[in-house]
């Protein structure tokens, strides 16, 4: 069903409105950090062959998301009822992740006793502006086609602050743990390199290495031409190279690559 979901998200995409874009879902389900145990509970609503609604979870599994096609808002009540009854709610931690343009879901949630507990800003860059941060001396860009999975997994391990769990080692060992491990980090990267998800555009990823070849910064890129959307996910810099402008240089590289393709 991945193509059904992707096409649905792309078809109803509206910048800054209506929920997460297509890469959000596909990036999550192909990632080794994602608990897919309860993915069978994700549900599509169809009108004939046309997808008109979707309820799904991400990480943690108690975070529930909604997507609905304009004109089918009458399904919101049914979708919320389904989420409450069937989607994971361990330790009463189920929460609905709602966005601008999803007021109909907010209203239905409030009727059932939900209340807003926090909000956050979804950052977007307008390509009418310009990004032109220079790569610091001593670093260089790595061609995405030449990526070394072990180096990239190590970058993500430390870049996402997992170093407190231990050093990045024994990455090829058997992984018998539910916690995040070097094995899971490596498995996720290796899988994405060897067998990319259907709509992956890893050829636009940005990888920055130091003079010794250690990967210092990684910025993934999902290009959705139908939406003119350049979706950056993920982004990390290893601790010893933070606050040096590497992420800014990576985003500038994305800008110079994606703007000529039509990104807005």
What does each of the following model-derived ranges do?
Residues 20-32, 57-61, 163-235:
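A conserved beta-strand-loop-helix scaffold within acyl/acetyltransferase catalytic domains
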Residues 152, 217-219, 228-233, 241-245, ...:
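Extended hydrophobic-aromatic, low-complexity segments
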Residues 58-63, 68-138:
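Acyl-donor-binding surface of acyltransferase catalytic domains
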Residues 40, 91-92, 260-263:
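Short, high-confidence coil segments that cap the C-terminus of an alpha-helix
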Residues 46-48, 125, 209-211:
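Active-site beta-strand termini and strand-to-loop segments that position acidic
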Residues 73-85, 237-239, 243-260:
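Conserved acetyl-CoA-binding loop-helix of GNAT-fold acetyltransferases
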Residues 10-87, 216-230, 238:
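Conserved donor-binding loop and adjoining core beta-sheet/short helix segment
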Residues 1-27, 134-184:
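Short amphipathic alpha-helix that is part of the acyltransferase structural core
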């Amino acid at each position: 069903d991945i193509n059904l979901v992707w096409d649905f998200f792309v078809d109803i995409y509206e910048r800054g409105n209506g929920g997460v874009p297509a890469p959000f879902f596909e990036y999550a389900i192909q990632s080794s950090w994602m608990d897919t145990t309860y993915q069978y509970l994700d549900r599509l609503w169809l009108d004939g062959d046309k997808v008109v609604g979707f309820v799904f979870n991400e990480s943690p599994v108690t975070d529930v998301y909604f997507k609905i096609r304009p004109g089918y808002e009458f399904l919101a009540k049914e979708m919320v009822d389904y989420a409450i009854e069937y989607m994971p709610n361990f330790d009463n931690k189920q929460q609905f992740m709602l966005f601008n343009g999803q007021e109909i879901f907010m209203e239905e949630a409030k009727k059932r006793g939900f209340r807003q507990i926090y909000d956050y800003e979804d950052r977007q860059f307008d390509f009418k502006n310009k990004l032109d941060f220079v790569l610091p001396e001593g670093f260089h860009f790595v061609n995405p086609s030449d990526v070394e999975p072990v180096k990239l997994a190590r970058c993500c391990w430390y870049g996402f602050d997992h170093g407190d769990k231990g050093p990045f080692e024994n990455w090829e060992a058997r992984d018998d743990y539910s916690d995040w491990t070097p094995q899971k980090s490596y498995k996720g990267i290796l899988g994405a390199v060897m067998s990319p998800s259907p709509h992956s555009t890893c050829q636009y990823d940005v990888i920055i290495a130091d003079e010794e070849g250690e990967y210092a910064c990684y910025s993934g890129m999902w290009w959705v031409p139908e939406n003119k959307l350049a979706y950056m996910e993920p982004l990390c810099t290893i601790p010893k190279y933070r606050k040096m402008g590497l992420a800014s240089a990576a985003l500038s590289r994305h800008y110079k690559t994606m703007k000529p393709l039509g990104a807005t």
